[in-house]
């Protein structure tokens, strides 16, 4: 009976979740340990984002490299080719910015949190943090006298409630005995004495209970003051963490927000300028002069037979090879590129590894001035297929799209003899075909 009564009387206190209850300060102490863990979580968060930025930067670089190669090998030409290529330049520059973002996240933001955490939390030899132990000891010291009084109060309350219970039980028995014929006067007197004794016990326990309760009330202000003092110290420590992490988050935002970067804005300003610089009419004129009616032509004319030059016809018929990359001089004396735009396959087909040959043919049905019969059965492309290895004597930067660029000491393959303008057709080790000045190289 007494056990069930105790449980019922203590139930309201057990459900109380107030900070002032004994032991409930532990949530405030735990917040210190949580702060250290949250610093670790933020560093992990930043580290993962930096990893994403690094991967994205590498993907942009790989994409730009691949498509720049595809564009160079593809059929696009002129100013639009340069505008298209500017997209790859944008990717390279944005890749650099994301690489810088990754570096800022790791070298600045993450290191800043790491250093602050090291200065704010001090590990103990026995485990845990010094700051946590100081808070725990402070709360325990402030709460100890009050907790002792509360223990006395619980005991006094328990005794008072038990006395009340016994009194009620004695009164009930005494009243019931008056209606029972079997109860003797002596027994009736004992029951009455029991009631009187229980009432005295109730009076004594009530007085003690009220006295202890009064003592608790007197110690409560001092208890609250001590607990408030320790709590405010914990609040100040937590405030430093909250303010610091807010500053770090603002730094992270600044590093992530490329829209506020002047370099980022400049990238797209330059990209727009490059795209707007594309001129369809210029490209059409260039194509007309290099692959259309604007090209120079050695029109057929009567030639006297010269017995001293038995291979004249064959040499004349080798000239059409220049359509793949030779340079011819027009009537005004200006060197014009005759590189055929159709010689390059489409951008996407290059990626599939397809090879595209020149579209024109020297078959007799399409070339009334050529043929193996007229050349004594020789193949005008044998010389191109074989080639001769040569070494550059000087640096040369191609001035036209059909010209090769190389450095002194580079080796390349010579694919034809020098023409009357002093140009040779060759192939770089990268596979690029084009023209170069014949006197800039020597045979290896």
Swiss-Prot record:
UniProt entry tagged with the keyword Metal-binding: no
Biased composition (Basic and acidic residues): 314-324
InterPro entries, sorted: AH/BAR_dom_sf (IPR027267), F_BAR (IPR031160), FCH_dom (IPR001060), PACSIN1/PACSIN2_SH3 (IPR035743), PACSIN1_F-BAR (IPR037454), SH3-like_dom_sf (IPR036028), SH3_domain (IPR001452)
UniProt-recorded Gene Ontology molecular function terms: phospholipid binding
Listed GO biological process terms: actin filament organization; cytoskeleton organization; neuron projection morphogenesis; plasma membrane tubulation; positive regulation of dendrite development; protein localization to membrane; regulation of endocytosis; synaptic vesicle endocytosis
Domain F-BAR: residue ranges: 13-283
Primary location class: cytoplasm
Name of the protein: Protein kinase C and casein kinase substrate in neurons protein 1
């Amino acid at each position: 009976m007494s056990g069930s009564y105790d449980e019922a009387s203590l139930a309201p206190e057990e459900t109380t979740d107030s900070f002032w209850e004994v032991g409930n300060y532990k949530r405030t102490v735990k917040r210190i340990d949580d702060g250290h863990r949250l610093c670790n979580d933020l560093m992990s968060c930043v580290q993962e984002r930096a990893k994403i930025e690094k991967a994205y930067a590498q993907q942009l670089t790989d994409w730009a490299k691949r498509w720049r190669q595809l564009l160079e090998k593809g059929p696009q030409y002129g100013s639009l080719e340069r505008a298209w290529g500017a997209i790859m330049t944008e990717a390279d520059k944005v890749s650099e910015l994301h690489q810088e973002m990754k570096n800022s996240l790791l070298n600045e933001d993450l290191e800043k949190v790491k250093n602050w955490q090291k200065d704010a939390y001090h590990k103990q030899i026995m485990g845990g943090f010094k700051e946590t132990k100081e808070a725990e000891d402070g709360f325990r010291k402030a709460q100890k006298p009050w907790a002792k009084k509360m223990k006395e109060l619980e005991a006094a309350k328990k005794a008072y409630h038990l006395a009340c219970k016994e009194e009620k039980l004695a009164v009930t028995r005494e009243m019931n005995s008056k209606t029972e014929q079997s109860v003797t006067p002596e027994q009736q007197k004992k029951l009455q004495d029991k009631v009187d004794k229980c009432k005295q016990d109730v009076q004594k326990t009530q007085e003690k209970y009220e006295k202890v309760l009064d003592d608790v009330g007197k110690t409560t202000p001092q208890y609250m003051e001590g607990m408030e003092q320790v709590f405010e110290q914990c609040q100040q420590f937590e405030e430093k963490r909250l303010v610091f992490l807010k500053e770090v988050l603002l730094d992270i935002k600044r590093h992530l927000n490329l829209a506020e970067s002047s370099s980022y804005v400049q990238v797209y300003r330059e990209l727009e300028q490059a795209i707007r610089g594309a001129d369809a009419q210029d490209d059409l004129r260039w194509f007309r002069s290099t692959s259309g009616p604007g090209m120079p032509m050695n029109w057929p004319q009567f030639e006297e037979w010269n017995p001293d030059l038995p291979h004249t016809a064959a040499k004349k018929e080798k000239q059409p090879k220049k359509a793949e990359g030779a340079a011819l001089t027009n009537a005004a004396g200006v060197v014009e590129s005759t590189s055929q735009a159709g010689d390059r396959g489409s951008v996407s087909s290059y990626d599939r590894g397809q090879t595209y040959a020149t579209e024109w043919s020297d078959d007799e049905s399409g070339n009334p001035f050529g043929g193996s019969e007229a050349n004594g059965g020789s193949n005008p492309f044998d010389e191109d297929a074989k080639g001769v290895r040569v070494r550059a004597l000087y640096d040369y930067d191609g001035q036209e799209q059909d010209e090769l660029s190389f450095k002194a000491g580079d080796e390349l393959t010579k694919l034809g003899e020098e023409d009357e303008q002093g140009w040779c057709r060759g192939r770089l080790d990268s596979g690029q075909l084009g023209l170069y000045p014949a006197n800039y190289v020597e045979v290896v």
